[in-house]
Amino acid sequence: EAGGYTGSPIAPGCMCVFSCYEVPHARVDGFDVCVNKPRTNAYRAPGSTQVCFATETIVDEICKELDIEPTEFRLNNAAKEGVRRVDGPVYGKVGMEETVQAIRDSDHYQTPLTGKFQGRGIATGFWFNCGLKSAATATVNPDGTVSLVEGSTDIGGSRTGLAMQLAETLGITAEEVKPAVVDTDSVGYTDVTGGSRVTFATGIAAIKAGNDIQQQMCARAAMIWDCDEAVVRYEDGCIIGSENNRFTFKELAAKINATGGPIAGR
C-alpha cells in the first residue's frame, strides 16, 4: 500500500521477498497500490519487513501442511554462498544456515512447551545495503589519540561504530578515537545517511584512512631508525623494525611533530 500517493517501497520489497531461500526459478511482480490512507515513507528496511512477514507466514503454513519442523524446512531451503538472488545478485557468505542452526541448537528452542497457551515461532528476514560514496580523514595527535573526521550524519550511533572500526585497524582503543561529523565544506563528498550504508561505506573510508596511517607511521619509524622502510611492519598497534626496534602507537605519535609533522590518513 502506497497511501494516497504513489511511491511505496515496492522495489526493495520485490528484491527481498524470497531472499532468505534458494529459489532457482522465480518471477516477482510488484504493484504500488494507492489507497485512502496517509502516504507511506521509508523506515528501517522499507518494504522488506512487510514481504518477509508474508513469506514467513506462508512458509509456516507449508510446514504445518506437510508436517515439517520449521527449522528443518528453512535449513533445507536456505540461501547460501553461490545462490543467485531472485533479482540477480549472487550471494557471498550470508549466514542464513548458521543462524537457523544456532536457533535450532539453542536451549530455548529445545525446551519443551508445557503450557496450554505456550507457543514458539521462528522467522527469517533479509535486507541489503547500498554503497554509494563516503569520505573520511584521520589525524594522529601527539597524545596518541586520533581525530576522525567524517560526513555521515549520525542518527543511530555511527560515530561509535566508525571509531571502533578505525581503532581496530590501528590496534588502539575506541576511546582513543575522537570522531566528528562535519559540514559539506570540511570533508570529501559523502552520500546520504540511509540505505543501511553508513557503517559499511563510511566504515570502509575510515578503515582505509587507518591503513594509510599505518603506512605513514612505518615510514616515519624507518626514518627515525635510519633503516629500509621494507623491514618495518605495523602489528597490533605497534610499529616493529629489525634489531629489536619497536614503538607503540602512542610512543611514535609523541614524536611525529619533531620528525616531519602531523600524520593524516585518508
Region annotations inferred by a language model:
Residues 75-141:
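Accessory "access/gating" subregions that flank catalytic or transport cores
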Residues 64-74, 171-175, 228:
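Helix N-cap / loop-to-helix initiation motif
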Residues 71, 94-98, 204, 250:
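Generic alpha-helical secondary structure signal
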Residues 1-51, 116-266:
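Gly/Pro-rich active-site capping loops and adjacent beta-alpha segments
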